[in-house]
Regions:
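N-terminal targeting/assembly segments of extracytoplasmic apparatus and virion spike/baseplate proteins
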Residues: 1-149
Length: 149
């Protein structure tokens, strides 16, 4: 999601009990600026205007052994490819409020290379049922990116 200086109006909606595909179809029928797709065991909600450039950044293969998606993300963000792309796109790492599960379970992520979005999906799938969120904030001179699990 790419946002500007003002927030969009909030809508009330309670999709509890509905099948996920139906929920995603309802969301994208109400807000035509988004589409959804399934890829490698993950579901992504993407802007119809095009995927943010940072998510399209090519990432080499890696293996991460960890107990937290946040730690896997932190390791991913230190990779040269991501640092270089953020510099070229003039994006700074934004403030993230961290939440964590007190029951840490070890898991491994083996990624054979692809885009940053595919790497984030690989982390989510490896950990089980994680959800990740991507936001670019562009307000005046401020250009930040927030990626969180």
């Amino acid at each position: 999601m790419i946002v500007g200086c003002r927030e969009d109006a909030k809508r009330q909606w309670d999709p509890q009990g509905e099948p996920l595909g139906q929920v995603l179809n309802e969301m994208t029928s109400v807000d035509k600026t988004y589409r959804w797709e399934a890829q490698d065991g993950a579901l992504n909600l993407l802007p119809t205007a095009g995927e943010p450039l940072l998510l399209q950044t090519q990432v080499g293969d890696f293996k991460i052994d960890t107990t937290s998606s946040l730690e896997a993300l932190n390791q991913l963000k230190t990779r040269r490819e991501i640092q270089h792309a953020m510099l070229n796109l003039r994006l700074q790492d934004g403030l993230t409020i961290i939440t964590y599960s007190p029951r840490a379970t070890p898991f491994s992520v083996r990624f054979k290379g692809g885009t940053l979005r595919q790497a984030l999906n690989a982390i989510a799938v490896a950990h089980g049922s994680d959800v990740w969120d991507y936001r670019e904030i562009r307000c005046g001179e401020r250009k930040e990116v927030i990626i969180r699990f």
